[in-house]
Swiss-Prot record:
Function text: Part of the RFC clamp loader complex which loads the PCNA sliding clamp onto DNA.
HAMAP family the record matches: RfcL
Subunit annotation: Heteromultimer composed of small subunits (RfcS) and large subunits (RfcL).
Name of this chain's protein: Replication factor C large subunit
GO CC term, one of those recorded: DNA replication factor C complex
Entry-linked InterPro entries: AAA+_ATPase, ATPase_AAA_core, DNA_replication_fac_RFC1_C, P-loop_NTPase, Rep_factor-C_lsu, RFC_lid
Record gene name: rfcL
Keyword Ribosomal protein: no
């Protein structure tokens, strides 16, 4: 057997060697070819996302080999700060490679490893990199749906990678054993694949570890040696595992194997229990009773900060919900929690509200909470009952157009019209005042000129009249 790790030895050298992922290839290869033709695509970066061990990085490396591209790779640990990206990635992305390379590809691996708070400036630097690049940028992520990664998603071509089918993974592992001259049972390979949840990279590592230690791979050896790896479940996988759990330990593992925070986990389950159990009133009642119990426990934890109650929260949400059913129900159409969807829709409106509260708090020397509670509702009421007066207030308070729109709601167009009229009338008044000042200046010049000459009583009299007019204009 080879001393080289099998994941390196049997890594795909060509695009066609990458197992499955045909849809991903159909999207990514034409995108790369556009770069090589000298006409960069509209999306200057590609974001490859999917479960671990399905071939995201392998496909990128195969593309580099096949198209003779120089690969500049950075891991999440290499671009924690803005300076890290500016020092390496931006410099590489804006320059051409030396021969014999035909081009250069920038690979940012595991961008979902960036912390929304800890990695200051990294996301902004990646966006700057995408804007400036003269070479294709490819990023990989297991879960790209974090809110801090939204700007990157919007600027990238999203390429999804599916889990590798069990039959194709089995065929590949058996082929490795054949090339290495290792006896291998099909049942053992199936067991390894199931333990690793379709992660081909982890399956190859386990296969090699057993083969090197015992010279063969059997089901008895695999079941005795391999420990199931903990894997983070997506919300959809968590629901699938929860609603179809047979035992309480399976249900508890489902709700504790996701990286959702406690509030969001509760919302996901509370939203989808009625959808899953809705065809049976008794199961629905028992399921929602478990959800209600979890809500009470979590409320008690929040009030008293007694986190020793957390296991009871998980027991209510996990086994409590899963074992509420008296039969297995057909899979329902699960959905995102309505509260999360609503918050996403109103994100911009809440941002304007917070800016308005900060602006008015500064003007009125009040707290933001007082402004939100007392002043904003009053302004909204004025906008509805007296749009003309509200327009004057808006100008006086120097409110921006989004703030006016937030306060005026349905009367926005009418208020906007009044604001424009007030602005134009103020402009006219300002012009009239400017003209009056110019007249005053001219009269003052005439007066000074007449005083200097001092010829005759008539001129003095005229000067006095001019002075009187000057005083009257100033008074006006």
């Amino acid at each position: 057997m080879s001393a080289v790790p099998w994941i390196i030895k049997y890594r795909p050298k060509r695009v066609e060697d990458v197992i499955d992922q045909e849809k991903a290839k159909e999207v990514l290869i034409p995108w790369i070819k556009k770069w090589l033709s000298g006409t960069p695509p509209e999306k200057r970066a590609a974001l490859l996302w999917g479960p671990p061990g399905v071939g995201k990085t392998s496909l990128v490396e195969a593309i580099c080999n096949e198209f003779n591209l120089e690969k500049i790779e950075m891991n999440a640990s290499d671009f924690r700060r803005k300076g890290d990206i500016e020092r390496v990635a931006i410099a590489a992305a804006t320059k051409k490679p030396l021969p014999p390379w035909k081009g250069r590809l920038i690979l940012l691996d595991e961008v979902d490893g960036l912390s929304p708070r800890g990695d200051e400036g990294a996301v902004a630097a990646i966006l700057e990199l995408i804007k400036k690049t003269k070479n294709p940028i490819v990023m990989t992520a297991n879960d790209p749906w974090g809110t801090h990664l939204r700007p990157i998603r919007e600027e990238s071509l999203l390429v999804e990678f599916k889990r590798i089918p069990k039959t194709k993974a089995r065929e590949f592992l058996l082929k490795i054993c054949e090339k290495e001259g290792v006896y291998c049972e099909k049942e053992a390979v199936d067991y390894i694949i199931e333990k690793n949840k379709g992660d081909l990279r982890a399956s190859i590592n386990d296969l090699q570890s057993i083969a090197e230690a015992y010279g063969k791979v059997t089901l008895d050896l695999a079941s005795a040696l391999l420990v199931e790896r903990d894997r983070v479940l997506t919300p959809w996988e968590m629901l699938q595992s929860l609603f179809y759990s047979k035992y309480s330990w399976q249900a508890r593992k489902a709700v504790t194997s996701t990286d959702l925070d406690y509030d969001t986990l509760f919302l996901w389950i509370a939203e989808n229990v009625p959808k899953q159990y809705g065809d049976d009133p008794y199961d629905l009642w028992r399921g929602m009773e478990a959800v209600s119990r979890a809500d009470v426990i979590y409320g008690r934890i929040r009030r008293t900060m007694n986190w020793s109650l957390l296991p009871y929260f998980f027991n209510a949400l996990g086994p409590g919900v899963a074992l509420a059913k008296t039969k297995y129900h057909k899979r329902a159409r699960w959905s995102y929690p309505e509260k999360i969807v609503l918050l996403a829709r109103t994100k911009e409106e809440r941002r304007v509200r917070d800016e308005l509260a900060s602006h008015l708090a500064l003007l009125t020397h009040s707290s933001k909470s007082y402004v939100r509670r007392e002043i904003i509702p009053m302004l909204q009421f004025i906008a509805q009952v007296n749009p003309n007066y509200f327009a004057r207030l808006a100008l006086g308070l120097r409110l921006s157009d989004p703030m006016i729109k937030y306060l005026a709601k349905s009367k926005y167009q009418l208020v906007k019209k009044y604001v424009e009229e007030l602005k134009s009338s103020r402009t006219v008044k300002a012009e009239e005042q400017t003209k009056a000042k110019e007249v005053v200046k001219e009269l003052k010049k005439e007066y000074e000129k007449g005083t200097k000459k001092g010829k005759g009583e008539k001129r003095r009299k005229g000067s006095d009249e001019g002075s009187g007019l000057l005083k009257w204009l100033k008074k006006d």
